[in-house]
């Protein structure tokens, strides 16, 4: 199973490669759309990438339970040392 860094890096490398090919006009994609839309296409891709990342974010129930237990333990220690009420 690939780590998230490798998956993210693959997406970034692919995006940069496609952008460079279009920017250097090796692939004349950018000549078909107005110049003001070049950034818009990039922004749409960036927004989609963020939305996709949020939608596929894994919820770890075990980590949540462990974190809540550590918070309770820390509060108990702080109360014992009379730092908090």
Swiss-Prot record:
InterPro entries documented for this protein: DPM3
GO biological process terms, semicolon-separated: GPI anchor biosynthetic process; protein glycosylation
Pathway: Protein modification; protein glycosylation
GO cellular component, one term: endoplasmic reticulum membrane
Keywords: Endoplasmic reticulum, Membrane, Transmembrane, Transmembrane helix
Highest rank taxon of the organism: Eukaryota
Protein localization: Endoplasmic reticulum membrane
Pfam families, A to Z: DPM3
Membrane topology note: Multi-pass membrane protein
Transmembrane domains' residue ranges: 13-33, 37-57
Function: Stabilizer subunit of the dolichol-phosphate-mannose synthase complex.
Family: Belongs to the DPM3 family.
Name of the protein described by the UniProt record: Probable dolichol-phosphate mannosyltransferase subunit 3
Organism this protein belongs to: Caenorhabditis briggsae
């Amino acid at each position: 199973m690939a780590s998230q860094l490798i998956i993210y890096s693959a997406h970034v490398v692919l995006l940069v490669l496609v952008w460079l090919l279009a920017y250097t006009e090796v692939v004349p994609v950018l000549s078909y759309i107005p110049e003001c839309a070049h950034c818009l296409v990039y922004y749409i891709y960036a927004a989609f990438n963020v939305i996709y990342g949020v939608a596929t974010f894994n919820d770890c129930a075990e980590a949540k339970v462990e974190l809540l237990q550590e918070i309770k333990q820390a509060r108990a220690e702080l109360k014992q040392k009379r730092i908090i009420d």
